[in-house]
Amino acid sequence: MKLRISDAPFPGAPVMVMISGLGGLGGYWLAQQNALSQAYQVVVYDQRGTGDNADTLPEGYTLTDMAQELHRALALHGVQRYAVLGHALGGLVGLELALAYPRAVSALVIINGWLSLGTWTRRCFDARERLLLDSGPAVYVAAQPLFLYPPQWAQENQPRLEAEEALQNAHFQGTENLLRRLWALKTADYRERAARVTTPVQLICARDDVLVPWTCSQALHEALPHSRLDVMTSGGHACNVTAPQRFNSLLYAGLAALTPAPHKETV
């Protein structure tokens, strides 16, 4: 698996692995990547079956598979310990990593995640799946902003949405891959395992997320033994994209509380 690893900002800098959501592309993190690279060696990547890591996913592909693939790829690059920043699906992959490799994951930040798939989010995913199967990839991609962004932000950023739509159509991961990734996402359930997570976790969510209700993060917070919950008043499902300054401020505060502050050694 191909990873994009930035130069360490100073010797011994901690590593931050950024895992995107269902779309799978590492480019999702532009608004955080540059800022975090001042204090972390940042790792971004396109998930298996997407972008630079094109592949045909097997039937029965799971989030556990996604976590194992990433952990192996990091080990091949000599990365033994790292923090994880994950959005939705990416945050759940982070939970899988924390459960399977607790000594490797120093901290975990989950954006708009959940303990188990709620009825509303399942309805949204089922509707998107029907769009994909009945109307094709172009219609699926065109509808995606309805679930990701607040209406006012979307209206004010129409040129950006058009550019994103063109890019997503050009690099569409394929119907079968997307359906298998959706299946992995919909079947993940942490109700029986969350209490075993020893990694400190920050949960960030937005009250106006129309895809994943913010109360899903609240339920996850209550189930995790070592977590903090930060609720943004607005920003939608992709709140780190639509409100990066507010999001980054919460992220930095959370990371400071979860882990020792990264710093350059002085002599």
UniProtKB/Swiss-Prot annotation:
Domain AB hydrolase-1 as annotated: residue spans: 14-115
Source organism per UniProt: Cronobacter turicensis (strain DSM 18703 / CCUG 55852 / LMG 23827 / z3032)
Xref: InterPro entries: AB_hydrolase_1, AB_hydrolase_fold, AB_hydrolase_sf, Pyrimidine_utilisation_RutD
Gene coding for it: rutD
GO terms assigned for molecular function: hydrolase activity, acting on carbon-nitrogen (but not peptide) bonds, in linear amides
UniProt catalytic activity: carbamate + 2 H(+) = NH4(+) + CO2
Name listed for the protein in its UniProt record: Putative carbamate hydrolase RutD
Alphabetically ordered keywords of this record: Hydrolase
Entry keyword Hydrolase: yes
Protein family membership: Belongs to the AB hydrolase superfamily. Hydrolase RutD family.
GO aspect biological process, one term: uracil catabolic process
Enzyme class: hydrolase
Record flagged with keyword Hydrolase: yes
PANTHER family: MONOACYLGLYCEROL LIPASE
